[in-house]
Regions:
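Non-heme Fe(II)-dependent double-stranded beta-helix
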Residues: 2-47, 52-151
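Active-site region of the double-stranded beta-helix
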Residues: 119, 133, 146-154, 163-173, ...
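Short helix-to-loop capping/linker segments positioned immediately adjacent to catalytic or ligand/cofactor-binding
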Residues: 112, 146-151, 161-165, 211-214, ...
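Conserved hydrophobic/aromatic beta-strand scaffold that supports enzyme active sites
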Residues: 49-51, 139, 159-163, 176, ...
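Short, conserved beta-strand element in jelly-roll/cupin
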Residues: 116, 150-169, 217-220, 225, ...
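Conserved double-stranded beta-helix
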Residues: 2-4, 12, 25, 183-225, ...
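A short secondary-structure junction signal
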Residues: 136-143, 150-151, 170-176, 185-189, ...
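Short, solvent-exposed loop/turn segments at secondary-structure junctions
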Residues: 57-58, 128-131, 145, 167-169, ...
Length: 303
């Protein structure tokens, strides 16, 4: 896999707000120097993704895992090929525990999301994905396919993948097609279609290996940042161990989120969350006044 140091530098000055860009450099400094942050931004913009290793400590990972294991024990496995019939997916994570606010508004995630999407970006989805032994690959897909603008197009979303376990070629590391945001979507063989959402067991998500694919291997505690228009898929788990990630996904402030966050997280729970997380849920305004409630700022609902 290419490293951040291989990437071309990217202008750290976000077009929307140079002052905010400087704040990002300071915010990510515990993990990335200004130069490495610049190169990571270049990675995401140009080839579509960047991996930053060993961001979270073991005690943080264990806390998330304990919460998720409790809820997975009470939930069914995936309903179709896309979700994975040998996978557990949990949605609406902020409704399950406020601890996930720390992950959702982590300085690294915010720096990339705000750089590419602007400060009015929203949380589009936040789910955990636990691949059990024997899980097969997903169909190729993008995370912004619901926005029906032909590829190639600009960056409408940023997807973040937090590795709670070591992810490797054997246990289902996410497979990515670098630079595929530049392609015409019709070039992708084995891409997602409506049949993959059917609750049937006669469909197989497996397709032949794509020679252009890269497997995003990384140790536990690492994070991958990816453009939402990059073609990718969950890998197959050929081991006897689970592989778990949590993926918060962000969209531009004008876009409809994949999960209806204002319904997924009840107002009484949202009211106790940090302000930045509330804004990401939709208790915020996209310039000049998109998102108002009865002519007023939506955050008033929580007061």
């Amino acid at each position: 896999m290419l490293t951040i140091d291989d990437a071309k530098p990217h202008d750290l000055t976000a077009a929307y707000n140079a002052e905010l860009a400087a704040e990002h450099v300071e915010a990510v400094s515990p993990w990335l120097s200004a130069e490495r942050f610049s190169r990571a931004l270049g990675d995401v913009h140009d080839r579509g993704y960047a991996v930053i290793e060993s961001v979270m400590a073991k005690d943080e990972l264990d806390a998330y895992r304990d919460i998720l294991n409790t809820h997975m024990a009470q939930s069914p496995t995936g309903r179709n090929v896309f979700e994975g019939t040998k996978s557990h997916r949990l949605y609406a994570l902020l409704a399950k525990s406020p601890l996930f606010a720390n992950m959702i508004q982590h300085p690294l995630a915010m720096a990339f999301a705000e750089h590419f999407l602007g400060p009015t970006c929203l949380l589009s989805a936040c789910l955990s994905i636990n691949l059990h032994p024997g899980e097969t690959v997903q169909p190729w897909h993008t995370d912004d396919g619901h926005i029906t603008v032909p590829q190639p197009h600009g960056i409408f979303g940023i997807s973040v993948f937090w590795a709670l376990d070591d992810t490797n070629e054997a246990n289902g590391a996410t497979e990515i097609l670098p630079y595929s945001h530049r392609w015409d979507s019709h070039e992708i063989e084995g891409r997602l279609d409506n049949a993959h959402f059917a609750q049937r067991d006669d469909l197989d998500g497996s397709v032949e290996e794509n020679a252009a694919a890269v497997k995003a291997t990384m140790p536990a505690g690492s994070v991958m940042i990816m453009r939402s228009d990059v073609w990718h898929r969950g890998g197959a788990n050929h081991t006897d161990q689970d592989r778990m990630i949590v993926t918060p996904q962000y969209c531009a402030g004008w876009a409809r989120p994949l999960e209806s966050m204002l319904l997924a997280v009840p107002p009484e729970k949202a009211a106790s969350l940090p302000q930045r997380t509330q804004e990401l849920l939709g208790y915020s305004i996209h310039t000049p006044f998109m998102g108002y409630v009865d002519g007023m700022h939506p955050s008033r609902v929580l007061q």
